Amino acid sequence: MRKRIWVGLPLALVFGGIFAFHTVFHIPEQPEMTTISDGSFNQQLHCYESSTRASIDQEGSLNLLVWNIYKQNRANWQSVLTQMSAGAQLILLQEASLEDGLKRWIASGGWSGEQVNAFKAFDKAAGVLTLGWRKPRLACGYTQLEPWIRLPKSGLYSEYLLSDGQMLIVVNLHAVNFTWGVQEYQQQVNDLIAALKEHPGPAIVAGDFNTWSEKRLQAVTERLENAGLIEVVFSPDQRTRFITGLPLDHVFYKGLEVQKAEAPQTDASDHNPLLVSFTLPTDK
């Protein structure tokens, strides 16, 4: 009798864990995107297109905020987000949870945007969120499953018009974290930057790359450099770093000019934000 109990207990724990996982987490079969416009939030599958003719830059200037916002778990996230986004035309957030507080903040600022729902926990979506003061012409969501914990990370590919007539590609990435090698990591990066090699115009690839090892950092750097992108250098550089000393968050770009780049420190998230001021090329 005691032997049967010991045999049955592990099975009960396994099935109990599976039941609890599926009770807490909802993982969509394909990328689900929420589109945000004029204070409205609407569900859209995979891709979104618009006919906007408005340019994302402001008279040749483009200010960018990139930040893993830690699902807004810190009490001061809103005040810091307001401060850091002042003057920005483009915001790339990772681990953004579309709860009421963030929705109100987006609506009050008149932002347009898209969020890719990586998964829902207790019926609250979390994933990458790209916000702009103008709509994109195209936005497509991507997800890559974490091989160990079976929760996906998300990415968002967007195209914005620029005032000089060019098209700006923007990739907002939250890279997979828990992998034994770099195969899944490389696949996620490859999927999101596939169009960059064929794109002659400007591009920005930014987010939480989870580059906690030299192999990961080399894998992403080589692929982006092969696509013609350069990494932004920050000063001051208070980017969040792993115990290896490697930074986790990055901004890569091409076809633009960097005027200022800083990574200030904050306690409003477990990651520090990245602020970059770009201008359109003057020699075009």
Swiss-Prot record:
SUPFAM superfamilies: DNase I-like. One of its GO terms (molecular function) is catalytic activity. Disulfide bonds: none annotated. Keywords: Cytoplasm. Gene3D superfamilies: Endonuclease/exonuclease/phosphatase (3.60.10.10). It is found in: Cytoplasm. InterPro entries: Endo/exonu/phosph_ase_sf, Endo/exonuclease/phosphatase, UPF0294. GO terms for cellular component: cytoplasm. It comes from the Bacteria. Belongs to the UPF0294 family. HAMAP family: UPF0294. This is UPF0294 protein VV1_1880.
